[in-house]
C-alpha cells in the first residue's frame, strides 16, 4: 500500500463521498477532509472535477464504475482515468479494474456490497486482487464489519447509509479504519 494514501485516511477517518457539484464545493471548503471519493462526472468533466480536488490539496479517488461514458467492464476505463486526469486512484466493484489500477500505480479501493452470507463469504477471495482498501457497503453493519476485519489483511472502510455520529463510531469501533459518506453533516464531525 502507498503510505501517502494510508496516512491520509488514518489522519482523517471521515472521507467525503461526493455525488454532485454542490457536494464538491462543500467538501473542498472543509479543511478536515483529506480524501475525496468522486461518485459523479462524465468523460468530458471528470478531468476538471479531479483538478479542483487536487488544487484544494486533497486526494482524488474516482469511482470508475460511475463515470458516465466509461461503460462496460474493460480496463481501458482505468487507462483513461490515469492518462486524462490527475486522479490519485480509483474506486470500483470490479476486480479487473483494481488489478489494472495497481499496474498503473494508482491507489485502489475495492467496493464490496455485503447483501447476504454468500457475499460475505466471497470477501476473502476478493482480497487476492490486493486493493489498498476494501470498502464494505452498507457501512451500518458493525457485526459484519468486525467479521470482515478479522478475516482479511486489507484495511477496511465502511460506506453507505452512514447518517450520524453513532454510525461513524460503530463502524470505527468494529474495526473499520475510516468511513465514507455523502452526508455533509457527517463530514463536519
Short names for language-model regions:
Residues 38-42, 138-144, 160-189:
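Glycine-rich phosphate-binding active-site loops on the catalytic face of alpha/beta enzymes
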Residues 17-29, 73-80, 117-126, 164-168:
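Short, acidic/polar
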Residues 95-126:
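Histidine/lysine/aspartate-rich catalytic loop segments that bind and position anionic ligands
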Residues 73-97:
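Ordered, amphipathic secondary-structure segments that act as subunit-interaction surfaces
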Residues 14-18, 35-38, 60-64, 90-91, ...:
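Hydrophobic faces of well-ordered beta-strands that scaffold small-molecule active sites
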Residues 27, 94, 134, 171:
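Conserved, mostly hydrophobic/aromatic
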Residues 30-31, 84-85, 104, 129, ...:
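Structural motif
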Residues 1-61, 68-71, 86-87:
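Conserved N-terminal beta1-alpha1 strand-loop-helix module at the mouth
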Amino acid at each position: 500500500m502507498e503510505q501517502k494514501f494510508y496516512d491520509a485516511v488514518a489522519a482523517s477517518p471521515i472521507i467525503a463521498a461526493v455525488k454532485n457539484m454542490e457536494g464538491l464545493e462543500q467538501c473542498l471548503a472543509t479543511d478536515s477532509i483529506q480524501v475525496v471519493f468522486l461518485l459523479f462526472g462524465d468523460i468530458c468533466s471528470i478531468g476538471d472535477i479531479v483538478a479542483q480536488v487536487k488544487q484544494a490539496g486533497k486526494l482524488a479517488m474516482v469511482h470508475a464504475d460511475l463515470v458516465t461514458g466509461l461503460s462496460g467492464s474493460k480496463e481501458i476505463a482505468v487507462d483513461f482515468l490515469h492518462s486524462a486526469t490527475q486522479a490519485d486512484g480509483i474506486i470500483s466493484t470490479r476486480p479487473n479494474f483494481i488489478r489494472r489500477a495497481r499496474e498503473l500505480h494508482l491507489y485502489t479501493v475495492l467496493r464490496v456490497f455485503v447483501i447476504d452470507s454468500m457475499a460475505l463469504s466471497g470477501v476473502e477471495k476478493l482480497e487476492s486482487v490486493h486493493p489498498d482498501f476494501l470498502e464494505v457497503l452498507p457501512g451500518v453493519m458493525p457485526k459484519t464489519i468486525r467479521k470482515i476485519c478479522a478475516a482479511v489483511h486489507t484495511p477496511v472502510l465502511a460506506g453507505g447509509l452512514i447518517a450520524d455520529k453513532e454510525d461513524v463510531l460503530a463502524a470505527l469501533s468494529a474495526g473499520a479504519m475510516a468511513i465514507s459518506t455523502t452526508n455533509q453533516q457527517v463530514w463536519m464531525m
